[in-house]
Each structure stands twice: as C-alpha cells, then as structure tokens.
C-alpha cells in the first residue's frame, strides 16, 4: 500500500534549527548526477529496493529530454550536512501546469524524495519545495508525485519486506513516520499493488466466463506485431485509451502527443510482443477497447547490478531475465464504454 500525503496549505513545513545542514538547489549537470546518485548510496544495502535504470532517471529529470517540461517546471534540491560533508537528502519540486489547469488546483508536487532518518533533513527538504512553490503562486504541496502519472508515485506504508520493482517507489519504514511527525500533512490518496500467482492451468470457471463474454459481446483477443505498434500507430492508440480511461482518476493529466511518441519509442518498441495483449470489439469494426502490457521482471538483474548502469555487464543480466517466470504488469486499461460487459 502506498500513501499520497497532501499539505493543508503552504505555510512553513519545518522550523529550522541551528544546524550544519543546508539545502542547495541543483543548477548544473554535475549537481544532477549527484542528485541521481544519492538514491543508489542510500539504498546500497537494501534487499528490497530495486535500483532504477540510471539513463532513465537522467532522461526523466533532464529538461532537454523529457517532453513533460513542455508544461512543467521543476527545481531539484539537495540536503548537505557540511559537518561531514555529505549529501543526506534530495527532493524535486514540480509544478504541472496542465494538471493544475485540468483539476483547477494550485499544487506544487514533490517527488524523488529521499533522506536519511533525520527529521530535520526531511523537514527542511519539504520546506524548500513548499517555499519554491509558494514563490510561484502555489497553495498546496502534494506528493510523492512525478511530472506525470507515468512516473513513480506514492510513499510505501506497508509491505517493506517485499521486493519492489523498477516501476514503483520503494522507501524505508521511517519515511511515513516523518510525514506523520510533520503535522502539516494529511493522507490524500491510497494506491494498492497486488502480486498474483498464475496457475499452470487456467481454472475452468475462469475460462468458461471468458468464453461466455467473448461470444455474447463479440469481443476478441488481439495480438500485435512490433510493426503494428510502432510504425502502424497501434502503440499510439494504446496511450489514447490510457487518456480516455484515466481522465477522471485522481489528478490524472492527459498525455500529449509528444509524450505518447516518447513512451512508444522508449517502452513499446522494446517490449516482448508475447506480453502485450489487446481486446477488440467485433461490433465496432474491431476497435481496440482494452489492453494489457507486461514486461519481464527486471528486479533480480537490477539488484545484482546495484548501480543502475547497463555497462559493462548490466546488459547481460537484463538479457537473462527475458527467460524469467515473473512479469511486471505496467499497463492494464479498458475503455469506459464496455466495462459493464465484464
């Protein structure tokens, strides 16, 4: 279970004490590398955290590479203990103007929020994000969130002894305790994650129900070729369904054409076609109305790699997981119109 904390306003989050800790903005590429590196340092010995792919982090956080900066602005901050000296925390402050306009809110988001077990560090980081947002007319601090809903979201509050995946946030148990101690925040939303054991043989009741729905409503399972998804436009159609399906969900922001092109190029192009399945409506010219996208679980390979780099041996470890028996389901959507048909 993951929480979504939200501030009750943008007053001071934390009253600063006399301390050697300083919050500094990231203004250079070297600073951004330090910002990214802190996560790997903090979770180096964790059995449950999964290191993120470093190039993916760089592309997401770089203004010249992430299409979300067409409608977002952001500032990254580092907490440094100058008595050591050492980086002891980080936070990203983000304003998604498109989402704010869509939901009629004045929110500054915080994400990439990691810190040592020191309330002064976490409090000062959140205060820096709140102050940055307040200077830009924002009235509320909410997170952890990314630039868009395709980024990692939420703060883990249960399941700390379960292995994570590369697609979601993992954090130490002390994180939510810090949020509780900072009384300005309250829970805004919950996300649930499920682990499903797939039987070797499909249960007869399940198979019979699927066959009944398929024949009664003229729905059909559809597999794709890579050419159909990438060059043929079906990949874009998948994300158009995402926009349609999620438009009324919590703080969802419609994906732009540039974002969709980027996701098709980055993820769909690399996907295993056996793990992408669609459902089409035979009564509507075989229109795509639902789909699921999974990837081979990279958890074991990334944990062995630890530093998020693919070179020199990371590629080999990732290639081995293509034969694994665990998958991570990343996208599972159904258009609103056929949901009542099962």
What positions do the PLM features span?
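A conserved beta-strand-loop-helix scaffold within acyl/acetyltransferase catalytic domains
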Residues: 39-77, 93-101, 237-283, 288-329
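Glycine-rich, N-terminal phosphate-binding loop and its surrounding beta-alpha-beta segment
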Residues: 71-82, 87-100, 113, 122, ...
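A structural signal for short, well-ordered beta-strand segments and their strand-loop junctions
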Residues: 139-146, 187-195, 278
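Acyltransferase donor/substrate-recognition loop-hinge adjacent to the catalytic core
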Residues: 19-21, 169-250
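Single conserved hydrophobic/aromatic residue that forms the stacking wall/gate
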Residues: 1-17, 333-342
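Generic start-of-chain signal for non-secretory N-termini
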Residues: 16-33, 37-45
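Acyl-donor binding region in acyl/amide transferases
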Residues: 100-184, 309-339
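Flexible glycine/acidic-rich beta-alpha junction loops that bind and position SAM and/or redox cofactors
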Residues: 147-155, 197, 297-303
């Amino acid at each position: 279970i993951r929480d979504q904390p939200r501030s009750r306003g943008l007053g001071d989050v934390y009253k600063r004490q006399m301390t050697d800790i300083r919050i500094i903005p990231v203004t250079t590429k070297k600073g951004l590398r330090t910002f990214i590196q802190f996560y790997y340092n903090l979770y180096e010995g964790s059995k449950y955290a999964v290191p993120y792919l470093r190039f993916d982090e760089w592309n997401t956080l770089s203004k010249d590479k992430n299409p979300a900066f067409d409608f977002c602005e952001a500032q990254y901050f580092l907490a440094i203990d100058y008595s050591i000296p050492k980086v002891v925390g980080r936070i990203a402050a983000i304003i998604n103007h498109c989402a704010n306009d869509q939901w009629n809110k004045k929110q500054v988001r915080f994400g990439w929020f990691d810190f040592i077990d020191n309330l002064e560090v976490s409090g000062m980081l959140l205060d820096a994000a709140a102050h940055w947002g307040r200077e830009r007319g924002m009235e509320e601090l909410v997170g952890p969130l990314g630039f868009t809903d395709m980024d990692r979201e939420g703060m883990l509050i249960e399941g700390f002894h379960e292995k994570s995946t590369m697609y979601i946030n993992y954090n130490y148990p002390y994180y939510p305790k810090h949020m509780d101690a900072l009384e300005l925040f309250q829970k805004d939303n919950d996300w649930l994650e499920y682990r499903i054991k797939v039987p070797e043989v499909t249960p007869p009741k399940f198979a019979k129900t699927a066959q009944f729905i398929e024949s009664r409503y003229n729905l059909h399972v559809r597999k794709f070729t890579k050419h159909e998804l990438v060059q043929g436009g079906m990949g874009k159609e998948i994300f158009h369904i995402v926009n349609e399906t999620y438009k009324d969900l919590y703080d969802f922001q419609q994906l732009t054409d540039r974002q969709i092109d980027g996701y098709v190029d980055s993820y769909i192009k690399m996907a295993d076609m056996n793990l992408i399945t669609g459902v089409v409506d035979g009564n509507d010219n075989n229109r795509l109305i639902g789909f699921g996208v999974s990837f081979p679980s990279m958890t074991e390979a990334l944990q062995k790699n630890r530093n998020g780099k693919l070179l020199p041996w990371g590629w080999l470890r990732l290639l081995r997981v293509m034969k694994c028996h665990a998958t991570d389901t990343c996208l599972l959507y159904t258009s609103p119109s056929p949901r009542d048909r099962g």
